[in-house]
UniProtKB/Swiss-Prot annotation:
Tissues in which the protein is found: Expressed in cotyledons and adult leaves at the same levels.
One Pfam family matching this protein: EFG_IV
Gene3D superfamilies linked: 3.30.230.10, 3.30.70.240, Elongation Factor G (Translational Gtpase), domain 3, P-loop containing nucleotide triphosphate hydrolases, Translation factors
Protein name: Elongation factor G-1, mitochondrial
Underlying gene: MEFG1
Amino acid sequence: MARFPTSPAPNRLLRLFSSNKRSSSPTAALLTGDFQLIRHFSAGTAARVAKDEKEPWWKESMDKLRNIGISAHIDSGKTTLTERVLFYTGRIHEIHEVRGRDGVGAKMDSMDLEREKGITIQSAATYCTWKDYKVNIIDTPGHVDFTIEVERALRVLDGAILVLCSVGGVQSQSITVDRQMRRYEVPRVAFINKLDRMGADPWKVLNQARAKLRHHSAAVQVPIGLEENFQGLIDLIHVKAYFFHGSSGENVVAGDIPADMEGLVAEKRRELIETVSEVDDVLAEKFLNDEPVSASELEEAIRRATIAQTFVPVFMGSAFKNKGVQPLLDGVVSFLPSPNEVNNYALDQNNNEERVTLTGSPDGPLVALAFKLEEGRFGQLTYLRVYEGVIKKGDFIINVNTGKRIKVPRLVRMHSNDMEDIQEAHAGQIVAVFGIECASGDTFTDGSVKYTMTSMNVPEPVMSLAVQPVSKDSGGQFSKALNRFQKEDPTFRVGLDPESGQTIISGMGELHLDIYVERMRREYKVDATVGKPRVNFRETITQRAEFDYLHKKQSGGAGQYGRVTGYVEPLPPGSKEKFEFENMIVGQAIPSGFIPAIEKGFKEAANSGSLIGHPVENLRIVLTDGASHAVDSSELAFKMAAIYAFRLCYTAARPVILEPVMLVELKVPTEFQGTVAGDINKRKGIIVGNDQEGDDSVITANVPLNNMFGYSTSLRSMTQGKGEFTMEYKEHSAVSNEVQAQLVNAYSASKATE
């Protein structure tokens, strides 16, 4: 193995980097110090940490609290990184690997399925202490099928670590989770992982982050060696080299900067200062005046820019090889915000949903958001983020969404699937409550205010399966399992096919649904037969169409009479709502008491379009006139009038079928590029990108989901088992006339045989 010289840096290099004296700032103090052995955890240290964590957290300064998530593309090393974080902070005392080869598995992958498959399926919460800072951590899945876990984690977090693979670079799910971070305005640091891997190129990944993620970013470290020669890191802020010794990298030792790296270090530090100065006025003034920048000044500028989301500092390392994790932890507490540095808002339901800024003070009224539900051993486990006030065991709290008054029977802090009972939690905390019934997204207060938090983004399912229990005796457990899964996961839906009577489950992909079928078998002892996956098509209209329908039945006894007049039209592109109903009747042509029944009728009709029986979306219905009968009009009559009116005008609105289109990213050896690209074209895919990464080609394409079934097998065959791919939902778009005709004919044929 090649070794790098460690001769002392010459005086000219030190002068270039200005003063490196110990700073009085709290952030700078985290990384400076006149010591060689920076951190070594012993059993005594772990015991001290455990003792500290028993103290009520609300007494700690809010400045010393961090709520962070760890997100990335699948197999980038998120859970491995979290395992090291827990070890170095003394939260666990042994390191276990993700796939559980030792029979244990990573702490944060508590489900048997997670340990067997080597992937994270559910987000998991934990907490730890690092240099007097309390850190709540949520480890999230990387597979696109479990994207809701990322959504609800980021909804309640104040900061995040975006993990990037030094070989794979910025991949499709990297782009997705970064977009989610932007949606919830979450400041982040990046961690380029796996520097020990063959083909590691952190500078290429940094440039990809700038181009693909539009990050204004720069490295805060330089690696000493790469691949099998990766030995340590050079901190560009404090101009120090760090090496990671010990069987698990627990001893971080400061050393001299290798002489042959001095030029690169000077160049990269200047690049860091210049990049940050572009978004920070204080640093810009010093940079433009060519004044020396001290470590504390640079660190404070990075913190300001990171919290303002105008800069993303980039850390490096190898979690698996136990290198670079402790400096990353320093970066988390130095650069990511505390809860009181983040602007959180609620909607005042007593004041027309006016936005109210939450102070984040423990002394304010309680405001907490339920963001995740689980079925625990002792009943429903509800994860809460406390935004303001204090919640205590035994308190009575109000569910603002339902109006119910609930007692808090048990309050816990989670450590993956383990829990620690606590008496209270204050603003900024992430905790869990047992024994309260609620839905994901509900807001709780102490009753003194009527605030609700804005909801999280929940994507629509794109795939469905017909399922039924093998044994009729399992019907009760079958229903119980499906009800629980729906409560836990907003993207998992259960319905009944009105024609076949089959139970239909819908979700974000094949893996998503397979996991729930397997969980049903393991957790509820229900074996189920599963039909072929089917795509969740949609229908929509393309032009305005009028309707004028009279529903009349008067053949003795109570009659039915209701007339509705108006039009249907497509909603503008990009509308958030999928269905709109507007009553524009002037006067009392239809009594106002019947209007809700009319809206209900149109909604019911739109649940099943006449082309292929799938839901109709992007639809606006306007009611302009109508007529009623003093005796025979009823809610049922007007509901039926709306249903028939919709069916009659639907064809005139020129309906089309929409299909889910997936963003597919393939990585294949270049020798197979032509074959794979040709196959994508056969599947009616559109190639939108083609990059070269060493000996591999990375192809990006938009492909109809209906043409992607069985693709894993086909790709293995085409590439001799060397190709890999990921895909995520992009949009629903109109099918071609040819495909629409085929789908309509197939639907008509199936109806004819019933």
